[in-house]
Each structure stands twice: as C-alpha cells, then as structure tokens.
Amino acid sequence: MISDIAAAAAAIGAAAVTAQVNIEANIAGIKDEALIAELSGVAALADGVADRAARVVTAVREEIST
C-alpha cells in the first residue's frame, strides 16, 4: 500500500537524523582535522536525505487525502 511508502520514508528520515546527530556528537572527540571534515560532509548529507524523506511522506499524505 502507498501508506507503507510513507512509513518507510519516515523511518529513513529518522535514521538519517539519528546518524547525523551521532556523527556530530562523536566529532567533538576527534582531533584529526581531515577526518572531522570528512565526517562533517557525511553528516551534512543527512539533511538532504531527511528532506527528501519528508517530501515523500507529504506527497503520500496528499495522495491519500484526495
């Protein structure tokens, strides 16, 4: 069902945000600047993933409400 797509997208969004917060928390203890830069870049990707997931959820909700 289409609602399963929304549920999966919401789970993906939550996973992306969780990963981002985890990376940000762990960066505080890292001294290697190159690794910090790499991890910061990866963490920034999570914003895009969470945003896309939210758009999918919104699209599904719009579809089922019409």
Question: Where are the model-predicted features located?
Answer:
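A structural signal for small-residue-enriched, beta-sheet-centric alpha/beta enzyme cores
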Residues: M1-T66
